[in-house]
């Protein structure tokens, strides 16, 4: 039986778009048929980078969506335009790969969710670490009961995000970035949900949030570049706090703590701790009842989430999973509906900052 091949439009021509293009080019069921972005020179450059000549090139999403043969749209634009992009693509009947964060407000998420539900299209959101080999291994072990019932999860996103990142000029702004947890810390929040869930392909839901924000970088024009090890003055400052710490109560009774820390003076790290009543995880080290007489930590020799470089992130696994979902008419465990809950937690924390009180979910 001949399997279908899906045409792909990649909307956005930045750093992460290149990783989407690579993944679609390697999947046997997809081919890039069009690229679009705000500037034509960026579109042309991306096409040249990946040897694509016979494709449509656009600066207008509406026109790009009309390009013949587009079945899937990858949204790789800045976060503050994701909502309008997703609504337009869903309205055109296209399946969607959506970069995180998906939106900048609960209102935008509701509108996106309504558009996707009405269109009946498939979606996946790029909480791409779910396909990291360590994450996959730990999730399998959790589902097998290697650590018993999970009662506490702790995850942290620690990255000195600053002007070395091309997206910082917009993401640092309160209006366009909103918060450290939304821009990038959401990876750690999604990880906490993923590991707190005992089922193989399901993340746990949160029922209550309490949060603090602080740190030192908000409004500060002095910044550190951990790639060069140098300090610089007169840099554009963050308009929101660089540190956020969440306390979470999960629906299944587990507790969690998640932080996003842009203010750290060190290389990128992504610490993971998972505690069960029959075992424990500390990053890639495990202690489990499966190993009677265990005298020391067992280290899993696999790829860890050790860099913010998107070239290190497992986009191929995400794209292959999503194409398989389309082929077999099933929903992704990381679809828009699921990812909306991760974002809902972030906006609940924003409410907590305003009131100083825990916030009960749902609020979406």
Predicted regions and their residues:
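N-terminal Rossmann-like dinucleotide-binding module
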Residues: 1-51
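C-terminal helix-rich "cap/oligomerization" subdomain common to oxidoreductases
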Residues: 1-2, 30, 41, 72-74, ...
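Contiguous beta-strand/loop segments that form the cofactor/metal-binding neighborhood of enzyme cores
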Residues: 2, 190-289, 316-330
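Beta-loop-alpha module in the N-terminal Rossmann-like domain of NAD(P)-dependent dehydrogenases
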Residues: 55-115
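Hydrophobic residues in well-ordered beta-strands that form the structural core
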Residues: 98, 104, 123-125, 154, ...
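Rossmann-fold dehydrogenase core element
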Residues: 111-128, 148-155
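Predominantly a Rossmann-like dinucleotide-binding segment in NAD(P)-dependent oxidoreductases
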Residues: 129-237, 356
